[in-house]
Amino acid sequence: MDEVPSSDGSKSACSGEVVMEQSVHELEEVFKKFDANGDGKISGSELADILRSLGSDVGEAEVKAMMEEADADGDGYVSLQEFVDLNNKGASVKDLKNAFKVFDRDCNGSISAAELCHTLESVGEPCTIEESKNIIHNVDKNGDGLISVEEFQTMMTSEMTDKSK
């Protein structure tokens, strides 16, 4: 685990923004395929049709459950924004877990100050152990001096939320 994978999202904010823009564009293209009548929203029947055309034997109850999960505003349709949000929610959890693995060099399920500092230095961010300890202190909910997967996810998602404001 000495290399930092290029697709883990742990690069600079600028490269992450480019990846996000590309994936939103790709999701728009997929959305257009689901939106058979071009009205800017996906209905339950459009979802069922596309899933069946892809070989999935989905029943009405499954389609209804999928629609309920995706339809955040409860209008009975999935808008482009709801579609993007749904897809990014699943991807971001996976991406965050992959990013966590990059930092968790000894694979023990937590990130120490030394691991944090080493990983930051490996991507060109100057760092001291003291700085790493301060970062950890700010997100360490249970006070063990380490960052758990949950604490890492909280830290990263609150950073993303702060940057979008």
Swiss-Prot record:
Record lineage: Eukaryota, Viridiplantae, Streptophyta, Embryophyta, Tracheophyta
PANTHER family: EF-HAND CALCIUM-BINDING DOMAIN CONTAINING PROTEIN (PTHR10891)
Residues holding Ca(2+) 4: 140, 142, 144, 151
Amino-acid positions noted as binding Ca(2+) 3 in the UniProt annotation, renumbered to this chain: 104, 106, 108, 110, 115
TM regions (residue ranges): none
Domain EF-hand: from-to ranges: 22-57, 58-86, 91-126, 127-162
Source species: Juniperus oxycedrus (Prickly juniper)
PROSITE patterns, per the entry: EF_HAND_1, EF_HAND_2
Superkingdom of the organism of origin: Eukaryota
Positions of Ca(2+) 2 binding: 71, 73, 75, 77, 82
Protein name: Polcalcin Jun o 2
